[in-house]
């Protein structure tokens, strides 16, 4: 299956942006809870 670069980048962004939005608060809370432990 051949995928052009623009489509690959679009999919990458589509996956990366929501992942970052979910991951950043999770890492902050995880580091905060581990720090208080």
UniProtKB/Swiss-Prot annotation:
Native source species: Pinus koraiensis (Korean pine)
Record's subunit section: PSII is composed of 1 copy each of membrane proteins PsbA, PsbB, PsbC, PsbD, PsbE, PsbF, PsbH, PsbI, PsbJ, PsbK, PsbL, PsbM, PsbT, PsbX, PsbY, PsbZ, Psb30/Ycf12, at least 3 peripheral proteins of the oxygen-evolving complex and a large number of cofactors. It forms dimeric complexes.
NCBIfam families named among the record's database cross-references: PS_II_psbM
Family: Belongs to the PsbM family.
Protein task: One of the components of the core complex of photosystem II (PSII). PSII is a light-driven water:plastoquinone oxidoreductase that uses light energy to abstract electrons from H(2)O, generating O(2) and a proton gradient subsequently used for ATP formation. It consists of a core antenna complex that captures photons, and an electron transfer chain that converts photonic excitation into a charge separation. This subunit is found at the monomer-monomer interface.
Protein name: Photosystem II reaction center protein M
Location(s) in or outside the cell: Plastid, Chloroplast thylakoid membrane
UniProt KW Aminoacyl-tRNA synthetase keyword: no
Gene from which the chain derives: psbM
Annotated membrane topology: Single-pass membrane protein
GO biological process assignments: photosynthesis, light reaction
Keyword annotations from UniProtKB, A to Z: Chloroplast, Membrane, Photosynthesis, Photosystem II, Plastid, Reaction center, Thylakoid, Transmembrane, Transmembrane helix
PANTHER family for the chain: PHOTOSYSTEM II REACTION CENTER PROTEIN M
Gene Ontology terms: cellular component: chloroplast thylakoid membrane; photosystem II
Matching InterPro entries: PSII_PsbM (IPR007826), PSII_PsbM_sf (IPR037269)
Main localization of the protein described in the UniProt heading: plastid
Pfam family, one: PsbM
Signal peptide: none
Bilayer-spanning residue ranges: 7-27
């Amino acid at each position: 299956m051949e995928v052009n670069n623009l489509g690959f980048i679009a999919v990458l962004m589509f996956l990366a942006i929501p992942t970052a939005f979910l991951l950043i608060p999770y890492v902050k809370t995880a580091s905060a809870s581990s720090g208080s432990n």
